[in-house]
Curated annotation (Swiss-Prot):
Disulfide-linked positions: 28-87, 42-134, 44-60, 59-115, 66-108, 76-101, 94-106
Full protein name: Basic phospholipase A2 6
The keyword Signal is assigned to this record: yes
Pfam family, one: Phospholip_A2_1
Record: active site: 63, 109
Cofactor annotation comment: Binds 1 Ca(2+) ion.
Co-factor(s): Ca(2+)
Biological role: Snake venom phospholipase A2 (PLA2) that inhibits neuromuscular transmission by blocking acetylcholine release from the nerve termini. PLA2 catalyzes the calcium-dependent hydrolysis of the 2-acyl groups in 3-sn-phosphoglycerides. Very weakly suppress the acetylcholine (ACh)-evoked current mediated by alpha-7-similar nAChRs in L.stagnalis neurons.
Lineage: superkingdom: Eukaryota
InterPro entries: PLipase_A2, PLipase_A2_Asp_AS, PLipase_A2_dom, PLipase_A2_dom_sf, PLipase_A2_His_AS
Annotated organism of origin: Bungarus fasciatus
Length: 135
């Protein structure tokens, strides 16, 4: 099944469509809701500094770096770029032209979703004080 599913996306502002796809991909690959990652560690969620706190936080740091690399391809804006992929729980397949902005962003999100699903989740690292723990 194609998981682009824009049927439920009609009321979502265009600028969040990629994050909506990433959310669906996270939930395809694993068993946790995407909300479990929004404020996790030093790198999950917006921004990121310091040393990752654990394996899951490293997944988010790697995802940030992957997006940084995707930005190097012309005017690729990962947070705005939508893409096409299929989800056959827990398998995710990115489609589209290899090397294109959409495919690069999809590959970043796919790798992160798989990494999130495999990494242990430490509840103590959710909602931490980033000023204190991420320098």
């Amino acid at each position: 099944a194609v998981c682009v599913s824009l049927l439920g996306a009609a009321n979502i502002p265009p600028q969040s469509l990629n994050l909506y796809q990433f959310k669906n991909m996270i939930e395809c690959a694993g068993t946790r809701t995407w909300l479990a990652y929004v404020k996790y560690g030093c790198y999950c969620g917006p921004g990121g500094t310091g040393t990752p706190l654990d394996e899951l936080d490293r997944c988010c740091q790697t995802h940030d770096h992957c997006y940084d690399n995707a930005k190097k391809f012309g005017n690729c804006i990962p947070y705005l770029k939508t893409y096409v992929y299929t989800c056959n729980k827990p398998d995710i397949t990115c489609t589209g032209a290899k090397g294109s902005c959409g495919r690069n962003v999809c590959d970043c999100d796919r790798a992160a979703a798989i990494c999130f699903a495999a990494a242990p989740y430490n509840l103590a690292n959710f909602g931490i004080d980033k000023e204190k723990h991420c320098q």
